[in-house]
């Protein structure tokens, strides 16, 4: 896996060095993982993406009902980590969202 080092955190977004990826995170995720600029999150990347996808998925479902496929497609637009999206959608389905 390519090294994931945080360039900056602006509002609720993580920007990475040498990468086009931007992850939307909640303040809870920022606190939970003690994220700050300069951190190497390579080892925590999958877990952070999963948590962020789960929270974003729950938020999207609070706005309107979506099919499992529709929710997955929407999250795929926001997150590069496809495994995290699949896990998050499956958990939301198990929880009855």
Give a label for each model feature.
Residues 1-97:
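An alpha-helical, amphipathic repeat domain used for nucleic-acid recognition
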């Amino acid at each position: 896996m390519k090294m994931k080092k945080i360039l900056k955190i602006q509002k609720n977004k993580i920007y990475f060095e040498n990468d086009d990826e931007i992850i939307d995170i909640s303040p809870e995720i920022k606190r939970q993982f003690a994220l700050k600029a300069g951190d190497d999150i390579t080892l925590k990347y999958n877990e952070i993406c999963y948590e962020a996808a789960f929270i974003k998925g729950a938020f999207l479902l609070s706005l309107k009902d979506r099919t499992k496929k529709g929710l997955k497609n929407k999250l795929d637009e926001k997150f590069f980590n496809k495994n995290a999206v699949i896990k998050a959608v499956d958990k939301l389905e198990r929880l009855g969202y």
